[in-house]
Amino acid sequence: MIRIGHGFDVHALGEARPLIIGGVKVPYHTGFIAHSDGDVVLHALTDALLGAVALGDIGKLFPDTDMQFKDIDSRILLREAFRRVKEKGYAVGNVDVTIIAQAPKMRPYIDAMRAVIAEDLQCGIDQVNVKATTTEKLGFTGRSEGIATEAVVLLVKA
């Protein structure tokens, strides 16, 4: 049996904090405005995992009203979601992530993001794809006001 999950996340840019995307620190003059570290890639992926096994979403499991998740490393959230996926008897078939951002440029960091995700999801790097695109300077991402991400995951019965 296979299951497919889809996730989406967006955060505004504007805080004086590190910009963490896909578990990787990306040099930039500003970071995400968020309750956690704001990692849009890992948040979208966490939602995709949870959705694939009908466990709700990131806000249900890790509400932004709970101070224990304030400034938390999103890798912790991803690993916990994946632990629950494994409890249901599934493993990752593959992951496909699309980052939507005008700036900063993601290409130099994509291989590191893939490695982080593969490690956290206990799969091969060849099962993880991360790509980035722009909106050709249209909308909030085009004005570099925020970054959005979509993620799709295919789970297979372990």
UniProtKB/Swiss-Prot annotation:
Q: Where 4-CDP-2-C-methyl-D-erythritol 2-phosphate is bound, by residue?
A: 9-11, 35-36, 57-59, 62-66, 133-136, 140, 143
Per its UniProt record, the required cofactor names are:
a divalent metal cation
Question: Which note does the record give on the cofactor?
Answer: Binds 1 divalent metal cation per subunit.
Q: Which UniProt keywords apply?
A: Isoprene biosynthesis, Lyase, Metal-binding
What Gene3D superfamilies has UniProt attached to this entry? Answer: 2-C-methyl-D-erythritol 2,4-cyclodiphosphate synthase
The terms under GO molecular function for this entry are:
2-C-methyl-D-erythritol 2,4-cyclodiphosphate synthase activity; metal ion binding
InterPro entries in UniProt: MECDP_synthase (IPR003526), MECDP_synthase_CS (IPR020555), MECDP_synthase_sf (IPR036571)
> Where is the site Transition state stabilizer?
H35, T134
Pfam families, alphabetized: YgbB
Write down the chemical reaction(s) this protein catalyses: 4-CDP-2-C-methyl-D-erythritol 2-phosphate = 2-C-methyl-D-erythritol 2,4-cyclic diphosphate + CMP
What biological process terms from GO does the record include? isopentenyl diphosphate biosynthetic process, methylerythritol 4-phosphate pathway; terpenoid biosynthetic process
* UniProt EC number: 4.6.1.12
Domain of life per record: Bacteria
Q: Where does a divalent metal cation bind?
A: D9, H11, H43
Its pathway?
A: Isoprenoid biosynthesis; isopentenyl diphosphate biosynthesis via DXP pathway; isopentenyl diphosphate from 1-deoxy-D-xylulose 5-phosphate: step 4/6
Query: What do we know about how this protein assembles, alone or with others?
Result: Homotrimer.
Q: What is this protein's function per UniProt?
A: Involved in the biosynthesis of isopentenyl diphosphate (IPP) and dimethylallyl diphosphate (DMAPP), two major building blocks of isoprenoid compounds. Catalyzes the conversion of 4-diphosphocytidyl-2-C-methyl-D-erythritol 2-phosphate (CDP-ME2P) to 2-C-methyl-D-erythritol 2,4-cyclodiphosphate (ME-CPP) with a corresponding release of cytidine 5-monophosphate (CMP).
- Give the record's family classification: Belongs to the IspF family.
Note the PANTHER family from the entry.
Answer: 2-C-METHYL-D-ERYTHRITOL 2,4-CYCLODIPHOSPHATE SYNTHASE, CHLOROPLASTIC (PTHR43181:SF1)
Protein's name according to its UniProt entry:
2-C-methyl-D-erythritol 2,4-cyclodiphosphate synthase
